[in-house]
């Protein structure tokens, strides 16, 4: 379910819509933009409660990601970023995000109180499984999503106090 809760009708007892269907179907991966703007924190927590091991963090990040507030383009569309929130100049609609995946994990652990295991799984193994990349495949070669024998050795090491990335490893080599 791409960008769960974003631009979807809310839950209603007579017209439940796609949200309960997605949560109840074990084949569906629930994608969330965990920036506190696209999806509010109680809904993120609810997704982990109702769809554990099927909730994946996504960013929907645009070119303004990790850049200062200001005017940007999203394709041919004019976008204004204020406080890290991207909106179309024409009508004020949300226009993608400026979220970094590491921030989604940090928010999950430090602000929502999710377990580090669940938060990291939502950024790694769950999306890898959704695309079949947790097994050898023609796209990534070695499987991804876990730190285990036979898997690609791509990972970040974070400070356990504040979850800021301290080291970046790719193919088993330290980059940062």
Per-range role (PLM):
Residues 2-18, 64-67:
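Histidine/acidic-residue-rich, glycine-tolerant segments that coordinate divalent metal ions
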Residues 4, 35, 61:
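Active-site metal-binding loops of divalent metal-dependent hydrolases
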Residues 17-32, 48-151, 155-158:
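His/Asp/Glu-enriched, well-ordered alpha-helical/loop segment
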Residues 35-41:
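Glycine-rich anion/phosphate-binding loop at the beta-strand->alpha-helix junction
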Residues 41-47:
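Catalytic cores of alpha/beta
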Residues 162-168:
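Short, Lys/Arg- and Gly-enriched loop/turn segments at beta-strand edges
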